[in-house]
Regions:
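Flexible, membrane-associating and regulatory peripheral segments of lipid-active enzymes
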Residues: 1-198, 393-395, 399-402, 406-412
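Lipolytic serine-hydrolase domain surface
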Residues: 172, 184-264, 268-273, 293-412
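Aromatic side chains
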Residues: 51, 236-239, 282
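Short, hydrophobic alpha-helix immediately C-terminal to the catalytic nucleophile
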Residues: 288-292
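Structural motif
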Residues: 177-179, 274-276, 300
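Short His-Asn-centered micro-motif
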Residues: 157, 182, 280, 304-305
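Soluble periplasmic/extracytoplasmic beta-strand elements of cell-envelope proteins
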Residues: 179-181, 235, 278
């Protein structure tokens, strides 16, 4: 969230200027110039091509884009040794394959990360690159090494371009409820986690939410037979977010691409567990676009610091999930005009009365990047949604009915 962490007033004016620039671009050059993206071959695509051309035990491998249920059936038909063999042959493909067992994806992505470390280490030593290029390679190498820590569970990894990653906190197979954190702009492998302002980065957000959900569950319910609270949280930085405040940040293209990926992830989660989405900033645009196509297992969509959800009101999202919204009083995004004109802007403010969301307190969040900070009412509310303890939610000031028809569903 690099751009959204800087001076509020500066960002407000820069966003308004960006809106004007986009309109000029669309009028003079059309969508093509604004949306042009490099189409170079990339590591993940090469891996998928190899999978497509590969054979296993004399038979063609299933389409990597097949429905997750079909892929799950394929992997279930194999022995453990056969599954590991495929992960070692095609680590990037298997590691990003919805339908593959989570533990197999973790294993495949460890192999892919190890290979990516080798690539970046060679780039660090390549003096044909600029100093800046070698420094970036060094940062990427250390990020990949961090993700290789034995206790980390990487569900998706793509080193292409700015990079994408998704990580699981908790036991995804045993969890009764799963929370998915969907971050906003400037999210990539380098900004995925931070030492400074830890809880403004996807990894920090998800880890903070996981700890808060465990605390909520431990404080209100008996533990499960295993002795551990049955929740899991996914830090989902597995879409290409807008880079900075510009054309992509004020239009829906990145959100539309991300929405497909988000829906695929949710459908592929093992078992029949319920899912809650936590959508921050531009991530709320992704969640808004995806809402209509999400499966019914998604029971809650909570947005924080939202520029809009590409809908005039909550009903227009077309989902049966409960829609929650919050915004800290010091969040600069509240100063951005909520509009949608010629595809620019993201529509009605989700915390406004006319939108019709259930508005929650965000006390203590202290601006745009603080919603997942420990000790805030925003994080406490997120955690209560995550464990299904709706009757203990704290509504926004001036309201007392945000949870009036939401029954607690927490179970051991």
């Amino acid at each position: 969230m690099t751009s959204f962490d800087s001076s509020p007033q500066f960002n407000v004016w820069r966003t308004l200027l960006a809106l004007a620039i986009v309109l000029v671009m669309l009028a003079t050059s059309g969508w093509t110039a604004a949306r042009h993206q490099r189409g170079d071959t990339n590591p993940l695509q090469r891996a998928l091509n190899a999978w497509s051309d590969g054979r296993f035990q004399g038979k063609a491998l299933p389409d990597a884009d097949a429905p997750s249920a079909k892929l799950a059936g394929f992997f279930a038909s194999l022995s453990r040794a056969q599954r590991l063999d495929l992960a070692e042959r095609y680590p990037l493909a298997v590691g990003n394959m919805n339908g593959a067992p989570p533990k197999l994806r973790y294993r495949a992505n460890r192999i892919a990360l190890e290979e990516a470390v080798v690539v970046e280490r060679e780039r660090v030593r390549d003096h044909r690159l600029s100093t800046e290029g070698r420094q970036e390679a060094d940062r990427r190498m250390h990020r990949f090494l961090s993700l290789l820590h034995p206790k980390r569970h990487v569900l998706a990894f793509d080193p292409t371009g700015r990079g994408r990653v998704a990580e699981v906190f908790g036991n995804l197979n045993r969890a009764a409820r799963v929370s998915v954190v969907v971050p906003g702009i400037d999210t990539d492998v380098l900004t995925y986690e931070r030492t400074y302002r830890t809880f403004s980065a996807p990894a920090g957000m998800a880890k903070s939410l996981y700890k808060a959900e465990r605390a909520q569950r431990e404080g209100s319910l008996p533990r499960s037979a295993s002795g551990a609270p049955r929740v899991a949280v996914i830090a989902w930085a597995d879409y290409t977010s807008p880079a900075g405040i510009g054309v992509d940040a004020v239009t829906a293209k990145r959100a539309e691409d991300g929405a497909v990926r988000l829906s695929d992830l949710v459908r592929s989660l093992p078992g029949k567990k319920s899912v809650a989405l936590y959508c921050h900033s531009y991530g709320s645009v992704v969640c808004g676009v995806s809402a209509r196509d999400l499966p019914s297992r998604v029971t809650d969509i909570a947005v924080a610091g939202s520029p809009g959800m590409r809908a005039a009101n909550a009903a227009q999202l077309g989902t049966g999930a409960r829609i929650w919204a919050m915004r800290d009083q010091d969040d600069w995004i509240g100063q951005i005009p909520n509009l949608e004109l010629a595809g620019v802007g993201h529509g009605t403010d989700p915390v406004s009365a006319e939108f019709g969301a259930r508005v929650l307190s965000a006390n203590g969040a202290a601006g745009h990047a603080g919603y997942f900070e420990p000790g805030t009412e925003s994080l406490d509310n997120f955690a209560r949604i995550g464990v299904g303890a709706y009757q203990t939610l704290r509504c926004a000031a001036g309201t007392n009915s945000c949870y009036h028809d939401a029954e607690d569903v927490v179970s051991a």
